[in-house]
Amino acid sequence: MASTFSFDIVSDFDRQELVNAVDQVIRDIKGRYDLKDTETTVELVEESINVSTDSEFTLDSVHTILREKAAKRNLSQKIFDFGKVESASGNRVRQEIKLKKGISQEIAKQISKLIRDEFKKVQASIQGDAVRVSAKSKDDLQVVMQRLKQEDYPVALQFTNYR
């Protein structure tokens, strides 16, 4: 039997689910009467989604559709970082929606401090863009998970490598 148990706290998303959500958004835009003739494009590139359309009103509609499709695919709304709306050529607007992945050092320190302050039998260590949490009891780890789910961090947290 293992002497200590651990899990990792990460901020990640399922890339394939995001691809599927963006494909559904594109299909939805082509099928909706109010968006058909707007020549709206939604493009998924490496670390962002680029949206180009004819007005800010249709851009808001695309945001709504994207949020709905992402939610249906169990993707957190916190992965989207909506950038500034830019004017493009010919009365068009475009926006880059960055995709947030990984836990920043600042947030990792907040998580680690919360664990140290509230749970004396649990250790937290920052490892790159993840936080490793370890304890002698699985029950302690489950309590930590429940506590972290109650907090509202600017990134989506997932718990992996439960050992």
Curated annotation (Swiss-Prot):
It comes from the Bacteria. SUPFAM superfamilies: YajQ-like. It holds the Pfam family DUF520. GO terms for cellular component: cytosol. This is Nucleotide-binding protein Npun_R4736. It comes from Nostoc punctiforme (strain ATCC 29133 / PCC 73102). PANTHER family: UPF0234 PROTEIN YAJQ. InterPro entries: DUF520, UPF0234-like_C, UPF0234_N, YajQ-like_sf. Nucleotide-binding protein. GO terms for molecular function: nucleotide binding. Belongs to the YajQ family. Keywords: Nucleotide-binding.
